[in-house]
Swiss-Prot record:
This is 1-deoxy-D-xylulose 5-phosphate reductoisomerase. The gene is dxr. Its cofactor is Mg(2+); Mn(2+). Its EC number is 1.1.1.267. The keyword Protein transport does not apply. It comes from Halalkalibacterium halodurans (strain ATCC BAA-125 / DSM 18197 / FERM 7344 / JCM 9153 / C-125) (Bacillus halodurans).
Length: 382
């Protein structure tokens, strides 16, 4: 039985991870988890799975939850708590499902503790891909993708030689506003943006899908996960989200991974790898019911965040850190009705333009640039 630690258990990926664990209690055991602000859900999860270790955000939350959990569950808090969860002794796999750059330090700690990393936190590789991949190689640690697109590529590459790969093709639904012109985007609301056509996701990633920044971050993540130059990473609009991604080889053969849009499938594959387990829930893919699959090229002028991501990734150094930090803050401002939807792009562009890149940043450099960028974004709103 594999011991599993989950960072971000009360979030969208976290709750779906616990669904997988509940469906395979003979294969997996939850040994540690961190939670966000939803302490009511956290309490339910703790009583259901009885993890020995739980981390919360603040000491006040720790005191609140500690009085409600069963005997045998220890509650810790803060960044130290996240790291304790990430490095829990009985965990074989860490599922990093927290949102944002807060997932970086726990991931590095888990790698040093030689845990297999199931990575749903894009920002870890976006902001510090060179540090994470280098440390993973140094400690012989596997980085297993949880994103459906990267999982699709990972599966398509099984048994293949990387020097025979021509390119990867990441598919994108286009998000909530895929059929709107840029003029129509001027007045869209938070409520409009949170209606994703295909996937069930958290608020931040749903907005990132609408701006296409989510796909931009996935491009940078793929660069690090598969050690590919950006010239070999393409993005294709595919509104049904049935083909999760494709790999083209030098002989022009293309292998695609298909399935109904259900995040629990790639989560389960990351946990069971290299094995496959039965998936008892969800819909079976019936292509005759789907009828048609649609594809369209990506318009970088229409989706400016994609252009920012490719450019930042190619420049490297601290540019992706700025991209990510500026985006996180801009999305939060939009969700709080302090910034327009198209204002998200403008803020990111200003942050990138002013930044003086550090070519080979240390962890301290990355954290400093991250905080400095966030402060700059807020200075634009005041």
């Amino acid at each position: 039985m594999k011991g599993i630690s989950v960072l971000g258990a009360t979030g969208s990926i976290g709750t779906q991870t616990l669904d997988v664990l509940a469906n395979h209690r003979d294969k997996f055991r939850l040994v540690a988890m961190s939670v966000g602000k939803n302490l009511t859900l956290a309490e339910e999860q703790i009583h259901q799975f009885k993890p020995p270790l739980v981390s919360v955000m603040t000491d006040e939350d720790r005191k609140t939850l500690a009085s409600k959990v069963p005997e045998g569950t220890r509650v810790v808090c803060g960044e130290e708590g996240l790291i304790e969860v990430a490095t829990a002794e009985k965990a074989e796999i860490l599922v990093n499902a927290v949102i944002g750059s807060v997932g970086l330090a726990p991931t590095l700690a888990a790698i040093e503790a030689k845990k297999t990393i199931a990575l749903a936190n894009k920002e870890t590789l976006v902001t510090a891909g060179h540090l994470v991949t280098e440390k993973a190689r140094e400690h012989g640690v596997k980085l297993l993708p949880v994103d459906s697109e990267h999982s699709a590529i990972f599966q398509a590459l099984q048994g293949e030689r990387m020097d025979r790969l021509h390119r990867i093709i990441i598919t994108a639904s286009g998000g909530s506003f895929r059929d709107k012109s840029r003029d129509e985007l001027n007045g869209v609301t938070v409520e409009d943006a949170l209606k994703h056509p295909n996937w069930s996701m958290g608020a931040k990633i749903t907005i990132d899908s609408a701006t296409m920044m989510n796909k931009g971050l996935e491009v940078i993540e793929a660069h690090w996960l598969f050690n590919l130059p950006y010239e070999k990473i393409d993005v294709l609009l595919h509104k049904e989200s049935i083909i999760h991604s494709m790999v083209e080889f030098v002989d022009r053969s293309v292998i695609a991974q298909l399935g109904t849009p259900d995040m629990r499938v790639p989560i389960q594959y990351a946990l069971s790898y290299p094995d496959r387990l039965e998936f008892h829930e969800g819909q079976q893919l019936n292509l005759w019911e789907v009828g048609k699959l649609h594809f369209a090229p990506l318009d970088m002028e229409r989706f400016r965040c994609m252009a920012f991501a490719y450019e930042s990734g190619k420049q490297g150094g601290t540019m992706p850190t700025v991209l990510n930090a500026a985006n996180e803050e801009a999305v939060e401002l939009f969700l709080n009705n302090q910034l327009s939807f198209l204002g998200i792009e403008d803020v990111i562009e200003k942050a990138l333009e002013r930044h003086e890149r550090i070519d080979s940043p240390s962890l301290a450099d990355i954290l400093h640039v991250d905080q400095e960028t966030r402060a700059f974004v807020h200075s634009l709103i005041k």
